[in-house]
């Protein structure tokens, strides 16, 4: 998750706000969640250079869904993924990345179209307890306000932390309306577009993704579909500022066009 700094908000406004915290921490960790049990988030992978820096979601044996801000400026030959493990630093298997496909209209200023696909050099061995693909939502579909979705990752456990947890964590959050989310973020000069969804406890805070979770899955557990990608937010689990996630339903045609290459 890209994190906004309050002083930068006041002094430099949206242009600086949109700059991500660069690897090894463009993604956020899970705040207010708990350790994921074996089999709870089998679609989760760790995207790595020399170590973990972003999350991702298994779509099939060759394809990983992640955020464009995670792969911006990255070279495929220097990246790998670890899957089939609840730990980002050991266990499971590692596979090298063959190709990176970031959305052509990714806007690092507004953090819009924050979606990317990764193709692996060799196939993953799926249908294991901690290694399974997740489905995609219908084209153009949106999440319903109030519905619960699951966010997972190895991000920081609190804002300002600089230590990643060794084990995968997850949190269930409620979807917040796009209108309300836009009203909240207008105070920080940020815009929530139709390509984004929001989630969290607006009234109390305390549940969110944080640095180290970027690119990771937001899943409708009931339907086993990845409906979002961890993208950006203002701090971590702050009251009045829900997390903002890429709306996967708006990119189904784009995803399928890349997977056919």
From Swiss-Prot:
**PROSITE patterns, per this entry?**
TRYPSIN_DOM, TRYPSIN_HIS, TRYPSIN_SER
Alphabetically, the GO molecular function entries are:
serine-type endopeptidase activity
Tell me which InterPro entries the record gives. Peptidase_S1_PA, Peptidase_S1_PA_chymotrypsin, Peptidase_S1A, Trypsin_dom, TRYPSIN_HIS, TRYPSIN_SER
Which residues are annotated as active site?
A: 69 (charge relay system), 114 (charge relay system), 214 (charge relay system)
Subcellular location, record wording: Secreted
Q: Which residues form the Peptidase S1 domain?
A: 30-260
Location, primary (coarse class):
secreted
* This enzyme's EC code(s): 3.4.21.-
**Name of the protein described by the UniProt record:** Mite allergen Der p 3
According to its UniProt entry, this protein's organism is Dermatophagoides pteronyssinus (European house dust mite)
Encoding gene (name): DERP3
């Amino acid at each position: 998750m890209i994190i906004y700094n309050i002083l930068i908000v006041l002094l430099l406004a949206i242009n600086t706000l949109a700059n991500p915290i660069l690897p090894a921490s463009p993604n956020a960790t899970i705040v207010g969640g708990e350790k994921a049990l074996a089999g709870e988030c089998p679609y989760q992978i760790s995207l790595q250079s020399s170590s973990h820096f972003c999350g991702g979601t298994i779509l099939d044996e060759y394809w990983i869904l992640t955020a464009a801000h995670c792969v911006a400026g990255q070279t495929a030959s220097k990246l790998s993924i670890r899957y089939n493990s609840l730990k980002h630093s050991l266990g499971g298997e590692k596979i090298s990345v063959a190709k990176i496909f970031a959305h052509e209209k990714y806007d690092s200023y507004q953090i819009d179209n924050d979606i990317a696909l990764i193709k692996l050099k060799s196939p993953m061995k799926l249908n294991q307890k901690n290694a399974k693909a997740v489905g995609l939502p219908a084209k153009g579909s949106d999440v319903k306000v109030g519905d619960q979705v699951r966010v997972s990752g190895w991000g920081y456990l609190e804002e300002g932390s600089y230590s990643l947890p060794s084990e995968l964590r997850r949190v269930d959050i409620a979807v917040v309306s796009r209108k309300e989310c836009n009203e909240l973020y207008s105070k920080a000069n940020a815009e929530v577009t139709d390509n984004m969804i929001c989630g969290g406890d607006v009234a109390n805070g305390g549940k969110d993704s944080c640095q180290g979770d970027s690119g990771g899955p937001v899943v409708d557990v009931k339907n086993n579909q990845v409906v979002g990608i961890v993208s950006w937010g203002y701090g971590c689990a702050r009251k009045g500022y829900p997390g903002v996630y890429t709306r996967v339903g708006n990119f189904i045609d784009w995803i399928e066009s890349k997977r056919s290459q």
